[in-house]
Design a protein with these regions (language model features):
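Walker B catalytic acidic pair
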Residues: 119-121
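Conserved P-loop NTPase motor "coupling/switch" region that bridges the ATPase
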Residues: 59-60, 115, 132-196
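Conserved nucleotide-binding/hydrolysis micro-motifs of P-loop NTPases
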Residues: 68-71, 104-105, 123, 148-152, ...
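Inter-Walker segment of RecA-like/P-loop motor cores
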Residues: 66, 78-113
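Hydrophobic positions in the central parallel beta-sheet of the AAA+
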Residues: 23, 63, 100, 116, ...
């Protein structure tokens, strides 16, 4: 079997990535392949070598993406490059691989000891998706992908909390947000830069 090939910048990204990171890249930059390559190398696979190197005991893989990407089977094409599939008859590893949409994230809140790729990061705010994400992040390994990075610190609040930098939303806001005292509703006046 032929080996998996990455572009130089993708291989560099895989080497720099850590669990709980956000992989930012433009549309069409190869974030999906890079994310799968990160998962693949974490469990013994090797990229940019002539022959395919199998993973060793990979955990189940869950990919949470947009309904559009799920329905177009975009992730299936990328998985095939690594001899993986959501079809158990074709997947050489026999681990569970699921591609589903953000609308169904709550279904996976009880999953443990797996690896999650969250595509098109949708963790802005503090709603139901974020609460399900916290449950998943606490019991699994995970990374996020985004082509549209957030504009403010609070856009990343869920990621900071999931990585253990803050206990909760209140802890984050005490350290980084100044609210306007002259409005009847919570309105952000400014964000504070972290002091180390």
């Amino acid at each position: 079997m032929a080996g998996v090939t990455l572009r130089d910048y993708q291989e560099d990204a895989v080497k720099r990535m850590k669990m709980g990171c956000i992989l930012n890249g433009g549309v069409g930059s190869g974030k999906s392949r890079t994310a799968i390559a990160y998962y693949y190398t974490q469990y013994g696979g090797k990229v940019n070598v002539p022959n395919y190197v199998r993973m060793v005991n990979p955990p189940d893989l869950y990919i949470i993406t947009t309904a559009h990407k799920r329905d177009l089977l975009e992730w299936e094409g990328e998985l095939a490059n690594f001899y993986m599939s959501t079809d158990p008859k074709v997947n050489i590893y026999k681990n569970k691989i699921v591609v589903d949409s953000w609308n169904n994230i709550k279904k996976y809140a009880g999953v443990k000891n797996s690896f999650f790729i969250f595509d098109e990061q949708r963790l802005v705010g503090y709603g139901a998706w974020v609460h399900s994400f916290f449950k998943i992040a606490a019991q699994n390994k995970w990374i996020l992908l985004s082509a549209t990075p957030g504009d403010t610190w609070s856009d990343y609040m869920a990621v900071f909390i999931a990585n253990g930098f803050f206990r909760n939303k209140t802890d984050f806001q005490k350290k980084h947000v100044v609210f306007n005292p002259y409005t009847k509703f919570p309105s952000v006046l400014k964000y504070l830069v972290a002091q180390f």
